[in-house]
Amino acid sequence: MRNMTTKQPRKQRKALADAPWHRRRKLMSAHLSTEYLEERKRKLPRAVPVREGDIVRVIRGEYRGREGKVASVNYRSLRITIDGLTYAKADKKQVAKPVHPSNVIIKKLDETDPLRLRRFEGAKK
């Protein structure tokens, strides 16, 4: 898949549906909160791919303002699920609500993976 040069919505949707996994990972990025960037006092990128265990806050949509830990990341549907974000089905069963990562801000990174943190050491702010 080459870089996008078309304006046609049909081709934009097709490119997203057929995107390879390394591009999907990039599409699963969310901005870091300004408070977290100031608190860390080290150079971090503005946006990083969301992972399970990150603490995020929803900033757009029906669940705006809600915070929680990322429960799962689905690269196939390009959605994440957050602990505590559920909706009721017709049979009253509670189901996790999928959210697009562009609608959240990362409040705190999951710091259990030292390789992930080392990768950001030389990143621009």
For each feature predicted by the language model, list its residue ranges:
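Intrinsically disordered, Lys/Arg-rich N-terminal extensions and targeting peptides
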Residues: M1-R51, A123-K125
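Residue-level "contact hotspot" at macromolecular interaction interfaces
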Residues: R46-P49, G61-R64, P98
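Structured, basic alpha/beta domains of bacterial-type, RNA-associated proteins
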Residues: E67-A123
